[in-house]
Amino acid sequence: MADNQSVLSVSIVTPDGQVYNEQGDLLIVTTKSGQLGIMPNHVPVIASLEVEEARIKRGENEDEIAVNGGFLEFSGNVATIVADSAERQDDIDVNRAENARERAEATIKKAQEAHDADTLARAEVALRRAVNRINVAKH
C-alpha cells in the first residue's frame, strides 16, 4: 500500500515479470467501457483493459507503457495492472513493431480472401498490439 495518501503506487506485471513499478499522481488506462483516470483516494475498481497505452503522470513527467490486454485492480492507492504483455516506451523496437504491423495486415488480407474467421480474429489482435506499440514508441 502506498504510504502517502496523495500518490498512487502503480505496478504493471506480465507473465514474464514486472515491467513497471513507480509512484504517480494520475493513472490513465483504456478499459472495455472507455477511458478511466485514477487519482489518489479513488474508489476501489477492477476493470478489464483494452490493447492500449497506460499513462502514468508523475509531476511534470509522464510514463507511457504499451499494455496488451489484461486487467486493472485498484484499492488503497495501489494500482496493479496484470497484462498479457507490456512494454515501456524506451524498450519498444519500432522496426520490429512496424514489421509486425505489416505481417498482421498481410494476414488480415489473406484471411478475408479465404473467409477464415479464426485467423482474421488473431491477425486483428496482432495488428492492434503492433499499432499500440508503434503509437507508444512515437510519443
UniProtKB/Swiss-Prot annotation:
Pfam families: ATP-synt_DE, ATP-synt_DE_N. Keywords: ATP synthesis, Cell membrane, CF(1), Hydrogen ion transport, Ion transport, Membrane, Transport. InterPro entries: ATP_F1_dsu/esu_C_sf (IPR036794), ATP_synth_F1_dsu/esu (IPR001469), ATP_synth_F1_dsu/esu_N (IPR020546), ATP_synth_F1_esu_C (IPR020547), ATPsynth_dsu/esu_N (IPR036771). SUPFAM superfamilies: Epsilon subunit of F1F0-ATP synthase C-terminal domain, Epsilon subunit of F1F0-ATP synthase N-terminal domain. NCBIfam families: ATP_synt_epsi, PRK00571.1-3. Produces ATP from ADP in the presence of a proton gradient across the membrane. PANTHER family: ATP SYNTHASE DELTA/EPSILON CHAIN (PTHR13822), ATP SYNTHASE EPSILON CHAIN, CHLOROPLASTIC (PTHR13822:SF10). F-type ATPases have 2 components, CF(1) - the catalytic core - and CF(0) - the membrane proton channel. CF(1) has five subunits: alpha(3), beta(3), gamma(1), delta(1), epsilon(1). CF(0) has three main subunits: a, b and c. This is ATP synthase epsilon chain. The gene is atpC.
